[in-house]
From Swiss-Prot:
Belongs to the long (4 C-C) scorpion toxin superfamily. Sodium channel inhibitor family. Beta subfamily. Has the structural arrangement of an alpha-helix connected to antiparallel beta-sheets by disulfide bonds (CS-alpha/beta). InterPro entries: LCN-type_CS_alpha_beta_dom, Scorpion_toxin-like, Scorpion_toxin-like_sf, Scorpion_toxinL, Scorpion_toxinL/defensin. Beta toxins bind voltage-independently at site-4 of sodium channels (Nav) and shift the voltage of activation toward more negative potentials thereby affecting sodium channel activation and promoting spontaneous and repetitive firing. Expressed by the venom gland. This is Toxin Cbi1. Residues 1-64 form the LCN-type CS-alpha/beta domain. Keywords: Disulfide bond, Ion channel impairing toxin, Neurotoxin, Secreted, Toxin, Voltage-gated sodium channel impairing toxin. The lineage of its organism: Eukaryota, Metazoa, Ecdysozoa, Arthropoda, Chelicerata. It comes from Centruroides bicolor. One of its GO terms (biological process) is defense response. It comes from the Eukaryota. PROSITE patterns: LCN_CSAB.
Length: 65
């Protein structure tokens, strides 16, 4: 699955232009296929995540940044 990975507060993982950080989060930590910093949203975005990986969803948003 694809989506925005979350931190332990349920918030999207913030980034500015650091694709390497997002790639590490998505591929190494969450076992996805690829990751990058989605510039317009300023958040990491992952592709090819396993079903167990939690991704941000507007309907279930619990982020209290």
């Amino acid at each position: 699955k694809d989506g925005y990975p979350m931190d332990n507060k349920g918030c999207k993982i913030a980034c500015v232009i650091n694709n390497q950080y997002c790639e590490t989060e998505c591929v190494t930590v969450l076992k996805g296929k690829k990751g990058y910093c989605y510039f317009w949203k300023l958040a990491c975005y992952c592709e090819g995540l396993p079903n167990w990986a939690k991704v941000w969803d507007r309907a279930t948003n619990k982020c209290r940044a």
